[in-house]
C-alpha cells in the first residue's frame, strides 16, 4: 500500500482533487478528520494508550462527512506496529486494504520531519491556487483566518513549507497540482498522475460530482456545496472583483516572491508594495481578524456546530 498525502492551504481545490482520486478503485480517499493535527499535541496527556485509540476512533465517527468503514479499537490494536498516533492513523486509513490511501489533511506537512511519519513513506501531492483567490474564499468561509493580512501570512507560511519539502523530497514522492491547470485541463493532470504512480487511467474521475461521496460532502455544510456540481472551469481570478484594491495590495506585499515563484502575475508594481507594517497596524489587523472569526463561527449552520461540539467533548475529557 502506498500513501498519498495532500499538502497546501485549504480553499485551494483539495476536496475537488480528493473526490477525483476517490473515483479510482485502487484509491481510498475519505474526507479527513484531521487526526494527526488534533491528537499530536494531546497525546502527552494520555497515560492510557487504549484511551487514545478509543478517542481517535470516536473522532472519526463524528467527522462532518461520514466514513463508511471505520475499524474497531481491537482491530487497530491488533494491526499497529508501534504504540504511536501515526500507526493508529495508518491502520484507520488502510483498514479496507486499498492499493493506495490518501489523506487530505493539508497541514500534515508539519509532520514531515517526524521519524514516525517518515516511516509511512508519504507521496506528497502539493495542490496550490492563486493565493488572492484563496483569500477571497476564506473571507466567505466559516473556517480559517478572516482579515487579509492574517490570510496572507498563513498562505505565505504554508507555501514556503511545501516548497521546502519539494526541495528535500525525491521526485517520485512529490507531485504538484496547480488548481487553475486542474480547472482548464483535468484530464492532463490526472493522466500524468496515473502514469507516474502506475494507475489505470479512466475518465470516470470527471463524474466525481455524481458520486455518493460527493453528495455526502455537498450536504454536510456550506464549505463543500460546490462538490455536487460539475467542474466550474471559470472558478478563478475572482479576487479581482471580490477583494478591495488595498486588500490585494496587502496580500501582494507579503507574498510577492511566492506568487511569482508559483507562476502568478502581480497586479501592483514593486513601487506600490508595502515594505513592512507597523506594530500598531498589525495589532489592528489581528483584532479585526479575531472579531471576524467569532462572527464566522456564529454563522455556521446547526449541523456543523453540533459536530464541533461533540468533537470538543471528546478531547476535553480527562485523558
Question: Where are the regions a protein language model picked out?
Answer:
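PAPS-dependent sulfation machinery
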Residues: 28-110, 118
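P-loop (Walker A) phosphate-binding loop of NTP-binding proteins
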Residues: 9
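A generic secondary-structure signal for well-formed alpha-helical elements
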Residues: 24-31, 190, 197, 201, ...
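Active-site micro-motifs of SAM-dependent methyltransferase domains
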Residues: 23, 29, 35, 133, ...
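PAPS-dependent sulfotransferases, especially Golgi type II membrane carbohydrate sulfotransferases
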Residues: 1-5, 139, 200-319
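PAPS-dependent sulfotransferase catalytic domain
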Residues: 94-207, 211-230
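Alpha-helical packing segments of well-folded alpha/beta enzyme cores
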Residues: 88-89, 158-162, 189, 247, ...
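A conserved segment at the C-terminal end of the G1
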Residues: 15-27
Amino acid at each position: 500500500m502506498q500513501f498519498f498525502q495532500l499538502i497546501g492551504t485549504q480553499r485551494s481545490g483539495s476536496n475537488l482533487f480528493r473526490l477525483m482520486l476517490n473515483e479510482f478503485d485502487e484509491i481510498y480517499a475519505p474526507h479527513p478528520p484531521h487526526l494527526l493535527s488534533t491528537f499530536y499535541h494531546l497525546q502527552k496527556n494520555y497515560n492510557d494508550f487504549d484511551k487514545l485509540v478509543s478517542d481517535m476512533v470516536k473522532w472519526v465517527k463524528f467527522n462532518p462527512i461520514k466514513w463508511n468503514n471505520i475499524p474497531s479499537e481491537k482491530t487497530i490494536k491488533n494491526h499497529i506496529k508501534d504504540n504511536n498516533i501515526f500507526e493508529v492513523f495508518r491502520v484507520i486509513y488502510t483498514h479496507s486494504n486499498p492499493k493506495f490511501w490518501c489523506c487530505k489533511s493539508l497541514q500534515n506537512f508539519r509532520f514531515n520531519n517526524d521519524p514516525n511519519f517518515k516511516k509511512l513513506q508519504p507521496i506528497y501531492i502539493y495542490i496550490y491556487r492563486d493565493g488572492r483567490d484563496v483569500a477571497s474564499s476564506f473571507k466567505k468561509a466559516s473556517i480559517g483566518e478572516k482579515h487579509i493580512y492574517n490570510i496572507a501570512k498563513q498562505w505565505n507560511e504554508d507555501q514556503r513549507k511545501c516548497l521546502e519539502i519539494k526541495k528535500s523530497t525525491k521526485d517520485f514522492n512529490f507531485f504538484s497540482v496547480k488548481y487553475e491547470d486542474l480547472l482548464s485541463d483535468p484530464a492532463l493532470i490526472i493522466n500524468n498522475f496515473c502514469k507516474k504512480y502506475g494507475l489505470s487511467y479512466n475518465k470516470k474521475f470527471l463524474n466525481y460530482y455524481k458520486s455518493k461521496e460527493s453528495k455526502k460532502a455537498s450536504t454536510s455544510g456550506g464549505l463543500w456545496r460546490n462538490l455536487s456540481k460539475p467542474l466550474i472551469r471559470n472558478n478563478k481570478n475572482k479576487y479581482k472583483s471580490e477583494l478591495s484594491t488595498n486588500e490585494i495590495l496587502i496580500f501582494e506585499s507579503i507574498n510577492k516572491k511566492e506568487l511569482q515563484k508559483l507562476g502568478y502575475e502581480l497586479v501592483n508594481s514593486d513601487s506600490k508594495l508595502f515594505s513592512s507594517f507597523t506594530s500598531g497596524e498589525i495589532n489592528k489587523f489581528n483584532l479585526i481578524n479575531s472579531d471576524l472569526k467569532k462572527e464566522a463561527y456564529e454563522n455556521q449552520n446547526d449541523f456543523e456546530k453540533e459536530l464541533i461540539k461533540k468533537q470538543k467533548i471528546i478531547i476535553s475529557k480527562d485523558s
